[in-house]
Amino acid sequence: PLLKIFQEVGAADKIEWVSLDEAYRLITLDENEKCDYIMPLGKDAFISKLEEYDPGSSAVVSKVFDLIESIEKTLDFVSNIQDFKPSMIKEIFSEHTDFLKVANYSVDEVLKSMGASQKTRDILNGYWCYLGQPTDELNVIHYFTMLHSYIIDGAVIPRGRSHQISTALLEAFTENGGEAWFNTSVKRIIVKNGVATGVELEDGTQINAKAVICNASPYNAFTKLIDEKEIPEKLKKEVNAKTLSAKGFAVFLGLNRSADEL
């Protein structure tokens, strides 16, 4: 789906993708249980490597991947529905029962119910930080879908990392007549009669538009960018009903020492 978006906006040929051999590496510094696990891509290779780290795990992990593939088939079925018919409900309940059984449970609940050991769960859950929630809260459908995308479909990264994606999108945008302003803060979104009609910049400049796209979180958009009186009560309730997920931050630290010295 992401590649399709790049193709649609004319940025696909501006990004060079590099295939990865490894899924991820897990390292802990716990004095009681230090670990260093390097997991490969590919279903069979992943199962075999996990068996090395946790002998006896392959049977359970194979069942986990069977469930992952079953969930993916259900999602493909639903996403390809063009003209919904009542008969499809029967098909969902008869042929997609795996999805229905686990859809309302967390990753931990499902893995524990399948008999996965603590070590197997720890290794399988290596991608949890990508979705920002701990696995006792993270929905199993969301996580297993990501495991399918990476472990089974394969993983790639842009040669220039995420910055190459940003520059490619910018180039495609400007080539199609767009104009990008950097270091330009928006003070508020202008709303008239329930419709966003433009934005006001920090310096007071107003820019009118037929549509406004805001990539700030709903909370920030509704509390900092839009006048409260312009926000429908329904949207206020939706935002207030949400709970915050786990948060993290990345530190890029340059050290003036060689790896051997450190």
Placement of each model-derived feature along the sequence:
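N-terminal FAD cofactor-binding segment of flavoenzymes
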Residues: 1-23, 115
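Short Gly/Pro-enriched turn/cap motifs at secondary-structure boundaries
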Residues: 15, 99-100, 240-245
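Rossmann-like flavin
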Residues: 32-138
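Short beta-strand to alpha-helix junction loop
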Residues: 96-109, 149-171, 181-183
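Residues forming anionic-ligand binding surfaces in small-molecule and nucleic-acid pockets
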Residues: 138-150
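Glycine-rich loop(s) and the adjacent beta-strand/alpha-helix scaffold that form part
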Residues: 158-176, 189-190, 200-262
